[in-house]
Amino acid sequence: MSDIEQRVKQAVAEQLGIKAEEIKNEASFMDDLGADSLDLVELVMSFENDFDITIPDEDSNEITTVQSAIDYVTKKLG
């Protein structure tokens, strides 16, 4: 597991109150992990803080699964 993957899963676990080891990469934040729209906003803010990146609103709409978050952060960090 990459450092980015581990950190994304940890942020998701803390935000949604679930164990990081139970989070699958293909899991949808809303459908599989029970996140609501406020949780998604807070997750995006957490990713921004944890990785020192900026995620524009139009990009945040594309971050719907754990893997899409990992891919997005990886791309932003280049």
From Swiss-Prot:
Q: What GO molecular functions are on record for this protein?
A: acyl binding; acyl carrier activity
Does the UniProt entry include the keyword Phosphoprotein?
Answer: yes
What domain of life?
Answer: Bacteria
Which pairs of positions does the record mark as disulfide bonds?
A: none
Q: Which residues form the Carrier domain?
A: 2-77
Key words of the record: Cytoplasm, Fatty acid biosynthesis, Fatty acid metabolism, Lipid biosynthesis, Lipid metabolism, Phosphopantetheine, Phosphoprotein
Pathway involvement of the protein, from the record: Lipid metabolism; fatty acid biosynthesis
Q: What is this protein called?
A: Acyl carrier protein
This protein's species is: Acinetobacter baylyi (strain ATCC 33305 / BD413 / ADP1)
Q: Which gene encodes it?
A: acpP
